[in-house]
């Protein structure tokens, strides 16, 4: 039978955190980094290989739509490649955190760098999303017609690559939250 103890005001929010409790957080960090690699690499490859050719009246006159026709799409591919490389470079550090869950300085560095990469990836994905939106809907006030009716495959490829990139944005948010949780567990007593 458990003993009933009356708590003083404020005592309920102080919890003892067992040593080694960051191992699960570190494993989840590693898994999310692997998912981030898949998302950013897939997005960069999908956009980088995205092109469609349409014949016009004859087979000698054709119109091409390629990702490098738009600066926003070029930025998107470059940013996703940079973030993918960052994910790969931080995998060993994530593995070190599994073995040594008390590594505090490297966790702080990772949180800062993860936040920088999150901002970079969000900027690149948002720039590409604005162009994809214009391609799908056009802009009637400037007489820009939607081009996805003619270049359907190109627009589908661009939209699909955005899914991978914005998925990686969500992964970064989760990684930053996990890093903050791991840092907060380093103290002997944590106020929740």
From Swiss-Prot:
It is found in: Cell membrane. It is a multi-pass membrane protein. Glycans are attached at residue 139. Keywords: Cell membrane, Cell wall biogenesis/degradation, Glycoprotein, Membrane, Transmembrane, Transmembrane helix. GO terms for biological process: cell wall organization. Residues 48-75, 129-161 are extracellular. GO terms for cellular component: plasma membrane. Residues 1-26, 97-107, 183-192 are cytoplasmic. Coiled coil: none annotated. InterPro entries: CASP/CASPL, CASP_dom, CASPL. Its main location: membrane. The chain crosses the membrane at residues 27-47, 76-96, 108-128, 162-182. Pfam families: CASP_dom (PF04535). Homodimer and heterodimers. Belongs to the Casparian strip membrane proteins (CASP) family. Regulates membrane-cell wall junctions and localized cell wall deposition. Required for establishment of the Casparian strip membrane domain (CSD) and the subsequent formation of Casparian strips, a cell wall modification of the root endodermis that determines an apoplastic barrier between the intraorganismal apoplasm and the extraorganismal apoplasm and prevents lateral diffusion. This is Casparian strip membrane protein 1.
């Amino acid at each position: 039978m458990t003993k009933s103890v009356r708590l003083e005001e404020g005592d309920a929010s102080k919890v003892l955190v067992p040593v080694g409790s960051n191992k699960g957080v570190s494993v989840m960090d590693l898994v999310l980094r692997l998912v981030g690699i898949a998302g950013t690499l897939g997005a960069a490859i999908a956009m980088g290989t995205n092109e469609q050719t349409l014949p016009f009246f004859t087979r000698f006159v054709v119109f091409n739509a390629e990702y490098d026709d738009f600066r926003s799409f070029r930025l998107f591919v470059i940013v996703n490649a940079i973030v993918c490389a960052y994910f790969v470079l931080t995998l060993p550090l994530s593995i070190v955190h599994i073995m040594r869950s008390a590594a505090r300085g490297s966790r702080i560095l990772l949180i800062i760098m993860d936040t920088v990469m999150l901002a970079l990836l969000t900027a690149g994905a948002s720039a590409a999303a604005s162009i994809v939106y214009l391609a799908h809907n056009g802009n009637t006030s400037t007489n820009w017609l939607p081009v996805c009716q003619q270049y359907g495959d190109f627009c589908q490829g661009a939209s699909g690559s955005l899914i991978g990139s914005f998925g990686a944005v969500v992964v970064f948010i989760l990684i930053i939250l996990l890093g903050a949780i791991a840092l907060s567990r380093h103290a002997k007593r944590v106020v929740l």
